[in-house]
């Protein structure tokens, strides 16, 4: 990868960012089986959940770059692993400080392209049955329309904005990209690096940004954006495909990249 990677040390999110943006947004789902998704991460600012993430290595969590929009360095960003409930004591739950955040060099606040980032934890996660990385999808292929995939998160579960305390899960059906690009849907905005899932009253919602779309046993994509009104069938959920970015991710994880460091 020849582009520089921008690394921001100990940066944080403002909770309002993921709440107010029409991006990444589980509505119409159900409570997930406790600890059945040991890769799930909760990105937290000052102790409040703001975005989801996926543990992809013992010290790295993959999420969405737009979760960084409007950040300030005066707040505290942490990553919670091993959790089902955000508030109840659980034996496998641990809150990790963040050493650094690496934004994809192509990501921008005014664009939905290249919407990925990586959190480097302050130290390696304690791995086991309840905390375990999920493999990346490495095959750069189109997921067949109608394929059922899994999303999970702690995002809002009602249009009124109610947030759950326990992890929610939803099975979604993959939509053909050409259909998703019709004028009646996303009107040409879906690039080859994105994919869509049907969202008729069942959708990711605010606070689910950055979480994984899991097809089979791998991270297929990352929750990115959709409609301001979650569950709008005319605005399918949009995800950033992971396979295209595997070389960048692996370069970041291995340290084989040129980085710019700012405070």
UniProtKB/Swiss-Prot annotation:
Its main location: secreted. Transmembrane segments: none annotated. This is Complement factor D. Residues 224-228 are annotated as: Self-inhibitor loop. Residues 1-20 form the signal peptide. Keywords: Complement alternate pathway, Disulfide bond, Glycoprotein, Hydrolase, Immunity, Innate immunity, Protease, Secreted, Serine protease, Signal, Zymogen. The keyword Repeat does not apply. GO terms for biological process: complement activation, alternative pathway; Notch signaling pathway; protein maturation; proteolysis; response to bacterium; retina development in camera-type eye; vascular associated smooth muscle cell differentiation. The self-inhibition loop inihibits the serine protease activity in absence of factor B (CFB) substrate. Serine protease that initiates the alternative pathway of the complement system, a cascade of proteins that leads to phagocytosis and breakdown of pathogens and signaling that strengthens the adaptive immune system. In contrast to other complement pathways (classical, lectin and GZMK) that are directly activated by pathogens or antigen-antibody complexes, the alternative complement pathway is initiated by the spontaneous hydrolysis of complement C3. The lineage of its organism: Eukaryota, Metazoa, Chordata, Craniata, Vertebrata. GO terms for cellular component: extracellular space. Glycans are attached at residue 46. It comes from Rattus norvegicus (Rat). It is found in: Secreted. Gene3D superfamilies: Trypsin-like serine proteases. CDD domains: Tryp_SPc. PANTHER family: COMPLEMENT FACTOR D, KALLIKREIN-RELATED. The active site is at 66 (charge relay system), 115 (charge relay system), 209 (charge relay system). SUPFAM superfamilies: Trypsin-like serine proteases. GO terms for molecular function: endopeptidase activity; serine-type endopeptidase activity.
């Amino acid at each position: 990868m020849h582009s520089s990677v921008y690394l921001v040390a100990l940066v944080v999110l403002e909770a309002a960012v993921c709440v107010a943006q029409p991006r990444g947004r589980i509505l119409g789902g159900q409570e997930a089986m406790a600890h059945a998704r040991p890769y799930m991460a909760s990105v937290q600012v000052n102790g409040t959940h703001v975005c989801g993430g996926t543990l992809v290595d013992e010290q790295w969590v993959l999420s969405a770059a737009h979760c960084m929009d409007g950040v300030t360095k005066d707040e505290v960003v942490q990553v919670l692993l091993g959790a089902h409930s955000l508030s109840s004591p659980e034996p496998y739950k641990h809150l990790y400080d963040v050493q650094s955040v690496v934004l994809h060099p192509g990501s921008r606040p005014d664009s939905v392209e290249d919407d990925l980032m990586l959190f480097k934890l302050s130290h390696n996660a304690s791995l086991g049955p309840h905390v375990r990385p999920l493999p990346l999808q490495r095959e750069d292929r189109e997921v067949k329309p109608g394929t059922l995939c899994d999303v999970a998160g702690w995002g809002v579960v009602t249009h009124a904005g109610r947030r759950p305390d326990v992890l929610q899960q939803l099975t979604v059906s993959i939509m053909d990209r050409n259909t998703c690009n019709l004028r009646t849907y996303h009107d040409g905005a879906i690039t080859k690096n994105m994919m869509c899932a049907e969202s008729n009253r069942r959708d990711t919602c605010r606070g689910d940004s950055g979480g994984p779309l899991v097809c089979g046993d791998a991270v297929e994509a990352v929750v990115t954006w959709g409609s301001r009104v979650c569950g709008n069938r005319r605005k399918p959920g949009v995800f950033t495909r992971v396979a295209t970015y595997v070389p960048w991710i692996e370069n970041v994880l291995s340290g084989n990249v040129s980085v710019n460091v700012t405070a």
